[in-house]
């Protein structure tokens, strides 16, 4: 009976109907907010991994996607709601992919034999889309305090005597902190230095894109929604508008990215 019931459920499942429910959007919210909270509370606050500029941008991108999901929860079947929810979700993914690729490039350059080649983006004061001063509104979340391309734990001296066994397992023991799982930076498999944080975030954004794009196509091709193609075009246009109008403008701030990178390399050399 259970096998027959599973087959019936699979037969009745429709991606178009599913994207009209709150479930996929709730999953999106849980994933994006969950990853952002893990980055802040676990890695930053508990394991002393200081976020760099691209890291805080990725947090912003995740929260943009979450806001899109929250809007969809209002009424996921409403076409106007869909315009804003899909647009914000795709916009956040677009930004996230860009920032992950930039972070991975910086990470590879800093850890290469020639760390001065090809890096041109490492600000101490971030510039968010639409020039939102998020680093002033919530500095503990959106102000970068780490060095570009370096995600090794930076433990303050006043915390040396207060580290528990769990923390020491990941960041090592004082004063050198060389025997922890993440002493050489965060990797999915630290012993092999396999898949760094930037690539893991990139995979997360790609997974979200694949699911959302499949939902979007199912919505467009739904024969029961004759106006879906018009609303889909509006979504594409709004994503482009958000991307190009939202590009941050910084006429007054002096960006010495290469000099900052040089300081990073000297610090860790």
Swiss-Prot record:
GO biological process entries: protein folding
Transmembrane spans: 25-47, 62-81, 198-220, 230-247
Any Pfam family matching the protein: DsbB
Record has Repeat as a keyword: no
GO molecular-function terms, A-Z: protein-disulfide reductase activity
The keyword Magnesium is assigned to this record: no
Subcellular location: Cell inner membrane
Disulfide pairings: 52-55, 122-148
Superkingdom, taxonomy of origin: Bacteria
Membrane topology reported for the UniProt record: Multi-pass membrane protein
UniProt keyword annotations, A-Z: Cell inner membrane, Cell membrane, Disulfide bond, Electron transport, Membrane, Oxidoreductase, Redox-active center, Transmembrane, Transmembrane helix, Transport
Subunit: Interacts with DsbL.
Physiological role: Required for disulfide bond formation in some proteins. Part of a redox system composed of DsbI and DsbL that mediates formation of an essential disulfide bond in AssT.
Protein name from the UniProt record: Putative protein-disulfide oxidoreductase DsbI
Encoding gene per record: dsbI
């Amino acid at each position: 009976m259970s096998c027959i019931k599973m087959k019936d459920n699979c037969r009745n499942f429709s991606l178009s109907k599913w994207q009209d429910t709150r479930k996929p959007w709730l999953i999106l919210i849980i994933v994006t907010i969950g990853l952002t909270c893990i980055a802040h509370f676990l890695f930053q606050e508990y394991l002393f991994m200081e976020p760099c500029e691209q890291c805080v941008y990725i947090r912003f991108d995740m929260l943009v996607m979450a806001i899109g999901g929250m809007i969809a929860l209002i009424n996921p079947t409403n076409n106007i709601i869909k315009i804003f929810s899909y647009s914000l979700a795709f916009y956040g993914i677009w930004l996230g992919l860009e920032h992950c690729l930039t972070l991975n490039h910086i990470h590879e350059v800093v850890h290469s034999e020639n760390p001065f080649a090809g890096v041109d983006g490492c600000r101490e004061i971030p510039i968010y889309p639409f020039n939102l001063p998020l680093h002033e509104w919530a500095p503990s979340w959106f102000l970068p305090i780490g060095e570009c391309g370096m995600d090794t734990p930076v433990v303050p001296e006043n915390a040396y005597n207060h580290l528990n066994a769990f923390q020491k397992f990941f960041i090592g023991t004082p004063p050198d902190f060389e025997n922890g799982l993440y002493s050489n930076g965060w990797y999915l498999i630290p012993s092999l230095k396999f898949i760094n944080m930037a690539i893991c975030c990139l995979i997360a954004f790609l997974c979200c894109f694949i699911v959302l794009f499949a939902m979007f196509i199912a919505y467009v091709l739904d024969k029961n929604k004759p106006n879906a193609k018009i609303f889909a075009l509006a979504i594409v246009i709004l994503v482009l508008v958000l991307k190009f109008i939202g590009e941050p403008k910084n006429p007054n701030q002096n960006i010495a990215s290469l000099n900052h990178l040089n300081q990073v390399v000297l610090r860790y050399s």
